[in-house]
């Protein structure tokens, strides 16, 4: 399946998009040849709107035979942004409401939690006890989020943003080793991984069975951009072959951030053409 991340919707309608904007966007997506889309609440102020109007969006998606591939809880970046937020219950009750919204989309089995760049005062330093307190707090909070998501019958994926306390995929592996948790997975955001200096070609094998979704975008590894695949220097043959070779059966979802709505159709068409070419040429498909 080829789909799009929420970047499609905020590129068309700004980050203050409404549920009605999503419905309009689905109709455009259908005409552009996509069959998957990702749900998102960008601003917490929209939470009640989504609680009351998600059913209408789900009905329109069914009418168009469009499938929600994951829910990105973008507004929950706040839950891991700094020490005070991290070491509190911030976001846990909101995640329960996210599961209520996602329940309107029975085929949507993944909820993605983006991890915020971690903030601290300029000039701050940490001793080993301070670091351990933060790390333990992060592990505890991720387990709490996972418990809520899994109680709804879904899986939790992490979107590892550059600068987050988790650090990268090695942080996810460490979390798994230290807590024994094997169910929390990874939303493979190629742009984030590449700008974190990850060895991107190895990630599908390294996290085989733990990649629950994708945000497929390009950049040049030194800036966290969201360009169409083919406009940066990511090796897309390696990424796509690796995913297929290691059993990934989910949607291939583009994430392209456009500066103006007028650019959206062409940018996503270009990205889609690149993915179709690479998928079509893969010997692992």
Predicted feature residues:
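Short glycine-enriched, charge-decorated loop/helix-capping segments at active-site entrances
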Residues: 46, 84-87, 128-129, 226-231
């Amino acid at each position: 399946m080829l789909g799009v991340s929420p970047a499609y919707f905020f590129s068309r309608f700004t980050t203050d998009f409404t549920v009605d904007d999503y419905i309009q966007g689905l109709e455009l997506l259908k005409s552009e040849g996509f069959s998957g889309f990702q749900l998102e609440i960008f601003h917490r102020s929209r939470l009640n709107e989504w609680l009351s109007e998600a059913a209408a969006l789900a009905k329109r998606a069914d009418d168009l035979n469009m499938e929600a591939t994951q829910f990105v809880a973008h507004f929950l970046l706040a839950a891991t942004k700094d020490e005070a937020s991290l070491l509190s219950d911030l976001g846990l009750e909101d995640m329960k409401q996210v599961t209520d919204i996602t329940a309107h989309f029975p085929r949507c089995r993944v909820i993605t939690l983006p991890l915020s760049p971690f903030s601290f005062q300029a000039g701050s330093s940490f001793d080993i006890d301070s670091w351990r307190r933060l790390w333990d707090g992060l592990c505890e909070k991720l387990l709490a989020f996972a418990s809520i998501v899994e109680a709804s019958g879904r899986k939790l994926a992490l979107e590892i943003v550059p600068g987050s306390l988790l650090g990268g995929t090695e942080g996810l592996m460490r979390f798994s080793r230290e807590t024994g948790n094997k169910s929390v997975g990874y939303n493979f955001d190629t742009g984030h991984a590449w700008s974190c200096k990850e060895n991107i070609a190895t990630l599908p094998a390294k996290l085989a069975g733990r990649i629950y979704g994708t945000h497929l975008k390009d950049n040049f590894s030194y800036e966290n951009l969201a360009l169409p695949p083919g406009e940066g220097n990511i090796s897309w043959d390696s990424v796509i072959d690796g995913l297929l070779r290691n059993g990934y059966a989910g949607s291939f979802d583009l994430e392209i951030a456009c500066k103006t709505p007028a650019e959206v159709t062409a940018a996503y068409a270009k990205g889609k053409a690149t993915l179709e070419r690479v998928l079509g040429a893969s010997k692992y498909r």
